[in-house]
Amino acid sequence: MLTTRFTDLVGCTVPIQQAPIGGCASPRLASAVAEAGGLGMVSVTGDPPEVVAAQLDQARQLSAGPIGAHFFMLMVDPDSAPELVAAAAERAPVVDFFYVDPDPALVEIVHAAGALASWQIGSAE
């Protein structure tokens, strides 16, 4: 076990976050990562809210470890984003956004549910 600020924040035992690799970031993979001590991530981009909920519920049934939700924001309909993010934030301790700056209203939804908002960047430039 390696304790860091990251492990303290997300509740994992090793400071590793699974890369949310599109369709490969399934509930089974995320739960395996969480069982190994890392932060598992389920990619929920493009799914309706009930599928987001079902995928995260499935991952949580497979592991007691922390499992987050990932949104590739270029593929999320802005009109449905609040409902999707709320469904994820109710079930995941971390909600991760990628590619564009997350809308502050979405971050507020995440925080209101008691989850952490994370912004994945593609490069330092």
Predicted regions located by residue number:
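Active-site entrance/lid segments in N-terminal catalytic domains of soluble metabolic enzymes
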Residues: 1-125
